[in-house]
């Protein structure tokens, strides 16, 4: 079929239908969302869970959600800004932090449903492929599907770091090793050791060592927070190992105490009737005193 020019006449504008708001804003890929949300018709009221991963400039957000007509219901959430509690105070948006956030989400969710002792996941991090399988006589493994949003799902993306953390934490998420760091598209082989290095922050540590030797000023500028918190390249692996153990030990979210805010009043409050009468009496008395002084003088 040849090129057909769109004639923008009166009928075109009269029948024009705008796209969904979140599509107009460039926030939602409805082609992907439809496939992530719609459940099999023979499963009736069973929700289809999604593991939502979003990476911002300063944070990594991981959520487990399911769709309802009223809107998405969030079952559990974990954030990279919670990691300082577990000993990771710097680099909260790198691949290693994404793994920790995914692990925290998985352990928190399973703890909430009382399944954390049944599905321990992969305790020893080796970067290799791991899949959670349901145990006979126990509740089935919690299954969900990765929702990467509008992120480019290229090999080594941080979204897959969060996915790997959640899988190692005990969630059943369908995936392959093709998008993990360490996969070679030419030889079609996966190097688990390269992936493990990324999970343990060794790629960052290697770059830190390189900058320390080559450009001291660039190192001080780029890794100022690492220097401030006394984090050296040799400490990185141990820091993440301790963080993984701490997350497994206590993944429960602690609510912050509510701050009591004293309300300030910027305008004058209304006067009662008694106050108004008293004010009038004071003004009268003041006026009469002024009249008397004027008469005396």
Swiss-Prot record:
Gene3D superfamilies xref list: 3.30.420.100
MF annotations from Gene Ontology: 5S rRNA binding; mRNA 3'-UTR binding; mRNA 5'-UTR binding; mRNA binding; structural constituent of ribosome; ubiquitin ligase inhibitor activity; ubiquitin protein ligase binding
Main location: cytoplasm
One GO cellular component, as annotated: nucleus
Gene Ontology biological process: negative regulation of protein neddylation; negative regulation of ubiquitin-dependent protein catabolic process; positive regulation of gene expression; positive regulation of translation; protein stabilization; regulation of signal transduction by p53 class mediator; ribosomal large subunit assembly; ribosomal large subunit biogenesis
Phosphoserine: residues bearing it: 185, 272
Cell location: Cytoplasm; Nucleus, Nucleolus
InterPro entries in alphabetical order: Rbsml_uL18_euk, Ribosomal_uL18_C_euk
Keywords associated with the record: Acetylation, Cytoplasm, Isopeptide bond, Nucleus, Phosphoprotein, Ribonucleoprotein, Ribosomal protein, RNA-binding, rRNA-binding, Ubl conjugation
Numbered residues of crosslink Glycyl lysine isopeptide (Lys-Gly) (interchain with G-Cter in SUMO2): 220
Claim: Transmembrane helix is one of the keywords in the record: no
Modified residues (Phosphothreonine): 232
Annotated segments matching region Disordered: 253-297
Cross-link (Glycyl lysine isopeptide (Lys-Gly) (interchain with G-Cter in SUMO1)): 220
Record keyword Phosphoprotein present: yes
PTM sites of type N6-acetyllysine: 5, 48, 220
Modification sites for N-acetylglycine: 2
Regions of compositional bias (Basic residues) in chain numbering: 258-268
Assembly behavior: Component of the large ribosomal subunit (LSU). Part of the 5S RNP complex, which is a LSU subcomplex composed of the 5S RNA, RPL5 and RPL11. Component of a hexameric 5S RNP precursor complex, composed of 5S RNA, RRS1, RPF2/BXDC1, RPL5, RPL11 and HEATR3; this complex acts as a precursor for ribosome assembly. Interacts with NVL in an ATP-dependent manner. Interacts with RRP1B. Interacts with IPO5, IPO7 and KPNB1; these interactions may be involved in RPL5 nuclear import for the assembly of ribosomal subunits. Interacts with RRP1B.
Function: Component of the ribosome, a large ribonucleoprotein complex responsible for the synthesis of proteins in the cell. The small ribosomal subunit (SSU) binds messenger RNAs (mRNAs) and translates the encoded message by selecting cognate aminoacyl-transfer RNA (tRNA) molecules. The large subunit (LSU) contains the ribosomal catalytic site termed the peptidyl transferase center (PTC), which catalyzes the formation of peptide bonds, thereby polymerizing the amino acids delivered by tRNAs into a polypeptide chain.
Family recorded in the similarity comment: Belongs to the universal ribosomal protein uL18 family.
Name the record gives this protein: Large ribosomal subunit protein uL18
Species whose genome carries this gene: Rattus norvegicus (Rat)
């Amino acid at each position: 079929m040849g090129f057909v020019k769109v004639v923008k006449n009166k009928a075109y504008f009269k029948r024009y239908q705008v796209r969904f708001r979140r599509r107009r804003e460039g926030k939602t890929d409805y082609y992907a969302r439809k496939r992530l949300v719609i459940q099999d018709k023979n499963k009736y009221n069973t929700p289809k869970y999604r593991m939502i991963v979003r990476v911002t400039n300063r944070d990594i957000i991981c959520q487990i959600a399911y769709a309802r007509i009223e809107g998405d219901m969030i079952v559990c959430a974990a954030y990279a800004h919670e990691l300082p509690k577990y000993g990771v105070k710097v680099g909260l948006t790198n691949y290693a932090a994404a793994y920790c956030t995914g692990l925290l989400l998985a352990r928190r969710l399973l703890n909430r449903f009382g399944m954390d002792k049944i599905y321990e996941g992969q305790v020893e991090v080796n970067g290799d492929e791991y899949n959670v399988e349901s145990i006979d006589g126990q509740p089935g493994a919690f299954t969900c599907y990765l929702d990467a949003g509008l992120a480019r799902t290229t090999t080594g993306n941080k979204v897959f770091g969060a996915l790997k953390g959640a899988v190692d934490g005990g969630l059943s998420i369908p995936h392959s090793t093709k998008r993990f760091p360490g996969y070679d598209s030419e030889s079609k082989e996966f190097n688990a050791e390269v992936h493990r290095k990324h999970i343990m922050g060794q790629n960052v540590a290697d770059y830190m060592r390189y900058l320390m030797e080559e450009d001291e000023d660039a190192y001080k500028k780029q890794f100022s927070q690492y220097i401030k918190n006394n984090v050296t390249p040799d400490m990185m692996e141990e820091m993440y190992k301790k963080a993984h153990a701490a997350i497994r030990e206590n993944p429960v979210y602690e609510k912050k105490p509510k701050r009591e805010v004293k309300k300030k009043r910027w305008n004058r409050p209304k006067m009662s009737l008694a106050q108004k009468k008293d004010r009038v009496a004071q003004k009268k008395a003041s006026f009469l005193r002024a009249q008397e002084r004027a008469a005396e003088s």
